[in-house]
Amino acid sequence: MSKQKKSEIVNRFRKRFDTKMTELGFTYQNIDLYQQAFSHSSFINDFNMNRLDHNERLEFLGDAVLELTVSRYLFDKHPNLPEGNLTKMRATIVCEPSLVIFANKIGLNEMILLGKGEEKTGGRTRPSLISDAFEAFIGALYLDQGLDIVWKFAEKVIFPHVEQNELLGVVDFKTQFQEYVHQQNKGDVTYNLIKEEGPAHHRLFTSEVILQGEAIAEGKGKTKKESEQRAAKSAYKQLKQIK
């Protein structure tokens, strides 16, 4: 592709990025960093640019910054959870499906600069590509403005999803319920599978929550894990109401 075409695409990106940051309530200093964050390798290849101008290095940095930010959030939010639980929660928050949700929610997926072939084959909707760009954006934001601004961005874009349980398995109800029971000194929690029905391709599982030797709630799901999650959710709500 021609230099003129590249210039048109880049200028269009910069205008859209400026508008997006204004919508989100953030400023920026180094637009080149953000352009790199959204430059997929296919875009770089199409215009014969330096192979290090794509977003993979920023993705590497952003991954570490995101883990640190989420770790601090969980450490403060759940003072009674052991390291193992915190690690599982963090892993789910920073996993690919969650990052895609964050990116799509604010339209960052629309900002990605792709090569012509990648665009035609549906690259813009590819989860791995979107999550990589989101991490690269976090890396660019960190380099441009520091960890405090990354934290403010996470408060606006990431943490609300976690707190409202909008991400499947992020603040999983079994963990949430276990933490609550521990805080209230109510004893041990166990789960029993009490029913499994339906054909092999469409099974329905029913599990119950046992607290202090008594079944206090049930949940149904397409998997044993899902039924336990739903049972924990029901039990958690019941105990919160009783309190």
Swiss-Prot record:
Keyword Metal-binding: yes
Domain called DRBM: residue spans: 172-241
Active site: residue positions: 63, 135
Binding positions (Mg(2+)): 59, 132, 135
Assembly with partners or alone: Homodimer.
Catalytic reaction(s) noted: Endonucleolytic cleavage to 5'-phosphomonoester
Gene Ontology CC entries for this record: cytoplasm
Name of the featured protein: Ribonuclease 3
Source taxonomy: Bacteria, Bacillati, Bacillota, Bacilli, Bacillales
The enzyme's E.C. designation: 3.1.26.3
GO biological process: mRNA processing; regulation of gene expression; rRNA processing; tRNA processing
SUPFAM superfamilies named in the record: dsRNA-binding domain-like, RNase III domain-like
Residues annotated as domain RNase III: 10-146
Enzyme class: hydrolase
Gene (name only): rnc
Biased composition (Basic and acidic residues): 219-231
Principal location listed in the UniProt entry: cytoplasm
Family of the protein in this entry: Belongs to the ribonuclease III family.
Listed PROSITE patterns: DS_RBD, RNASE_3_1, RNASE_3_2
HAMAP family for this protein: RNase_III (MF_00104)
Native species: Staphylococcus aureus (strain Mu3 / ATCC 700698)
Domain of life: Bacteria
Names of the cofactor(s): Mg(2+)
Molecular-function GO terms, alphabetical: double-stranded RNA binding; metal ion binding; ribonuclease III activity; rRNA binding
Region (Disordered) residue spans: 219-243
UniProt keyword list: Cytoplasm, Endonuclease, Hydrolase, Magnesium, Metal-binding, mRNA processing, Nuclease, RNA-binding, rRNA processing, rRNA-binding, tRNA processing
